A protein has these predicted regions:
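Gly/Pro-rich hinge or "lid" segments in bacterial periplasmic/extracellular proteins
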Residues: 90, 97-99, 194-255, 260, ...
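Surface-exposed binding/hinge segments that line
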Residues: 55, 123, 158-207, 224-231
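Aromatic- and charge-enriched surface segment that lines or borders ligand/interaction sites
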Residues: 109-154, 178-180, 265, 272-275, ...
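Detector for C-terminal structural segments
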Residues: 43-45, 87, 231-236, 240, ...
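Alpha-helical secondary-structure segments
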Residues: 61, 137-144, 174-180, 223-224, ...
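N-terminal lobe/hinge region of extracytoplasmic solute-binding protein
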Residues: 34-48, 58-115, 146, 220
Length: 608
């Protein structure tokens, strides 16, 4: 047995020099060998974006609008707002630098590109550990592929993507793998399109009971924090790992500083803001103009206990707007969809409610560099055009309230939304739409119920914004494979053969110039279908925070969607808690003293 162990050790150390495709069978091990001529790369020279002045310790408290329906990150009900807190603590092999977009190592120490143009080889950091103390190995990546393909997880998008796009995960030794994609792509894109997060093989048992069994189990992770306490319906606590294995790694040191992060469920945003003003929460997102201009003021701001910051970023824009469900027989008529788009006065929303701070979002994928089709503009507000389209579609009569009628059916829709802060915008839009004879009724659901309603395709219209990626993602949102099915992201149920073909070509295209042209074509075709009505966009984030939360000198990065995200591996975890300042501040507050008010405007990364 000692001989076998020595052989395995030699294989790990000399894997660069082994001939291609040969399988070595030693005892119970089966390792595929690496190609001879690959060149390993790493990057520890890019500038770090944390502060060496950061202090560890303290507890950060912030609010979430609803309790998660599950702790699973795949399967039924997993596509919810809370999931990012779990995924952000599951480290990827590599990431893109938040300022330079260079590839940087995380769970992997090195990577190498295969000559086939579709395979990347990775060396997993041998120090990497799961939160339960087990080592992270190649087996966890091989198992991740098995899990993502399994019918037991009830996740059709994952099943298809990890079968048709991620072709294989090959184990070469305990800490070396290859990820094989379906088609060649530019090198940086390989890390994006064919990425796979590891799954702790020793933790999971894949069978028909998997969904129910793991609904409330805390899955081992590799990031800085793990869930340590759950109060059902009330709060979740994440605790920083003692002696986290990645503490001193480049790009991770001096980050993820609080000892604990408490996520408190506060369903009403107005109530949450009151908790924040009382010091029961440490930070509050005040990006919306109503909050920044109106609510973020008063004694705690004037006396310098609470600071304000507006930080400009340069990121891909969220696809935020109104999604129309084509399973609604009225919305299946494109003339009705175009009429609705023409009846929505977003410029009035920008001028009146958003105080001119926002702009109209042009199209679904905006801010993706050359991949963005800058020729596309949203349908402009035009009541006459809306009325003409409705009359062409046969909606010629009105009831006593002025709402159009056809075949005894009113032109009336519910618009689902999961954040009450958007309610004033929806109400203003619906008032204008009435002038064209369209009734749009606000239908508020708490965020968990809202996501469930949308992902099960039960909505007429839904107002939401999707998180962004580093490249346009068409297949999940607009391919017919994901239409008319629950638990997929094609929430418009668009199914169009021509668009399907373009999306498939886009996925398979190896030439970047051609891929960009295809992206422009897809965006144009989707825009013509009017299944998504773009809302608004902004190029900044705004936060209010108690003065004991300290940010680095530059406050954030080009990619910072939020300055106080405690977990995000790319841009989060930069702040820290100054316990002495907290003690000093609370004493001053009690005695009636104060400090200079602070408002920060950082335009370093403001787009030109």
């Amino acid at each position: 047995m000692n001989v076998i162990k020595k052989q395995i050790a030699r294989l790990f150390l000399s894997s660069l020099f082994l001939p291609s495709l040969l399988l070595l069978n030693i005892s119970n091990f089966s390792f595929a060998e690496l190609p001879k001529d690959i060149q390993w790369e790493t990057n520890t020279d890019s500038p770090e974006w944390s502060s060496d002045k950061a202090l560890k310790g303290g507890t950060m408290r912030y609010s979430i609008p609803s309790f998660p329906p599950t702790l699973r990150t795949v399967g039924p009900d997993s596509n919810n707002a809370f999931r990012s807190n779990l995924l952000d603590n599951q480290m990827p092999l590599v990431e893109l630098h938040p300022n330079t977009d260079e590839v940087i190592p995380l769970l992997a120490t090195h990577w190498a590109y295969d000559k086939d143009g579709k395979t990347v080889h990775y060396k997993i950091n041998p120090l990497a550990k799961w939160s339960d103390g087990e080592n992270v190995t190649a087996d966890d990546f091989v198992f991740a592929l098995e899990l993502n393909r399994s019918k037991h997880i009830i996740a059709p998008w994952y099943n298809k993507h990890y079968t048709e796009q991620v072709i294989d995960v090959i184990k070469h030794d305990l800490h070396t793998i290859s990820i094989v994609g379906a088609t060649p792509k530019p090198q940086k894109d390989l890390h994006i399109f064919y990425s796979i997060l590891p799954r702790a093989k020793h933790f999971h048992q894949l069978d028909s009971n998997w969904v129910a069994k793991y609904n409330w189990k805390t899955e081992p992770n590799t990031g800085a924090y793990q869930i340590s306490k759950i109060k059902k319906g009330k709060s979740l606590t994440f605790t920083r790992k003692i002696n986290w294995w990645a503490n001193e790694l480049p790009y991770l040191r001096n980050r993820f500083n609080p000892d604990a992060v408490i996520l408190k469920v506060v369903r009403d945003p107005n109530t949450a803001f009151k908790y924040f003003q009382r010091g029961e929460l440490d930070t509050f997102n005040i990006t919306l103009p109503k909050l920044w201009h109106n609510k973020a003021q008063g004694p705690m701001f004037d006396k310098g206990f609470i600071h304000k910051i507006q930080f400009h970023n340069d990121i891909e824009q969220s696809a935020s707007g109104i999604f129309l469900n084509l399973n609604n027989e009225v919305l299946a008529d494109i003339r009705v969809r175009q009429a609705i788009a023409s009846a929505l006065n977003f410029q009035q929303v920008i001028d009146v409610i958003l105080r001119g701070d926002y702009q109209r979002l042009p199209t679904f994928h905006t801010g993706y560099g050359p991949y963005t089709n800058n020729k596309i503009k949203p349908i402009e507000f035009n009541l006459n055009n809306s009325i003409d389209l409705l009359e062409q579609a046969g909606w010629n009569n009105k009831d006593s309230l002025g709402i159009r009628i056809k075949n005894n059916q009113r032109l009336s829709f519910k618009i689902s939304y999961g954040n009450k802060l958007y309610e004033p915008q929806i109400l203003l839009l619906s008032e204008e739409a009435k002038k064209a004879g369209i009734e749009i009724t606000p239908y508020y659901l708490d965020s968990t119920s809202f996501y469930k309603n949308v992902i099960e395709k039960k909505h007429d219209m839904a107002w939401l914004g999707w998180s962004t990626g580093l490249r346009p993602a068409y297949w999940q949102h607009f391919h017919s494979d994901n239409a008319n099915k629950t638990q997929t992201n094609n929430i418009t149920n668009l199914a169009n053969i021509e668009i399907d073909g373009l999306i498939e070509r886009y996925r398979d295209e190896t030439n970047e110039k051609n891929r960009i042209q295809l992206a422009h074509s897809i965006e144009k075709k989707v825009n013509e279908k009017t299944v998504f009505i773009p809302a608004t966009m902004k190029t900044f984030t705004r936060s209010a925070f108690w003065r004991w939360l300290i940010l680095p000198k530059n406050e954030g990065t080009k990619s910072s969607e939020s300055l106080f995200n405690p977990f995000n591996i790319r841009f989060g975890g930069l702040f820290w808690i100054d316990s002495k300042m907290k003690f000093q501040s609370l004493a001053a507050k009690k005695s009636g003293d104060g400090f200079e008010p602070v408002t920060i405007i950082n335009t370093q990364f403001k787009p030109l």
